[in-house]
Amino acid sequence: MLRVVVLGAAAGGGVPQWNCGCPVCRKARSENPELRSTQASIAVSADGAHWYLINASPDLRQQLIATPQLHPESGHLRHSPIAGVILTNGEIDAVAGLLSMREGSPFMLYAHERVLAILRSNSIFNVLGENNVKRQPIEADKAFEPALPDGSQSGIEILPFAVPGKGAWYLEGKAHPTGGDAAGDTLGLRILDKGSGKYFYFLAACARVTDDLKSRLAGAALVFFDGTVWRDDELIVQGLGTKTGQGMGHISMSGEHGAIESLAGLDIARKMFLHINNSNPALLSGSDERKQLEQAGWQIPADGTEITL
């Protein structure tokens, strides 16, 4: 049995963003606190005692406090049920939370070599001493089983695979430690319970849906998918930014080649959007965009949502 907890569903900066006065952020601060969301991450466990984080968001400390499943056991001076962290990219949204895990509890860190190279190139991540935090490279299309703290099997198999995307934005125009944008900068994950054979997919970033990706996702029990923007130019139209969704490596929810249309008809039992930007009108309950999303069988999960497979 797999247990999955949504720690956060928002894109960079969360909802509300600290300096934003857009309609969504204004409502989240005042009359609609249910709109508030921390930055995208999930936790998964096969035994309910040992958990693996998928990405470590900048809001991680707040997320851990809000999630009883991830609290330390009583009777220990230092303890954490977190056995490991799996990174799907090197964006700030995915790695900054690692700095909140520097108090000496051991855990495994799994990431593509290109992402590990980013961490090595920035000495601030040296606070994660390698005696306590072992770094394990992972490869696209090569399944692995993350280890429990005692070295035994976790019962979870993770298959990383490359998806269309881009490198971290803070490296734009700069030399990547291992070269320019390439496969490995953005990964999707298939996460499988070896006992039951149940599995789900996690894609917090994806620039487009390819035929290969459709084949992977078809028939899945659950898919978490990139929901950053409703339409490609919404940041520009709303005066919130200068980049399109595609320019940031993110597909739109709507439109002819958007996620909703591209993933329709694939017999996915449960579809959830994650990494949703504050500019996205689908966040507003009752909006036309939200109605279209829900009519197509999609959900936007609240922080703390738990799903069992």
Which residues fall in each region the model found?
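Residues at the starts of beta-strands that form the adenosine-phosphate
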Residues: R3, H50, M108, K134, ...
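Active-site metal-binding motif and surrounding structural segment of the metallo-beta-lactamase
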Residues: A49-A111
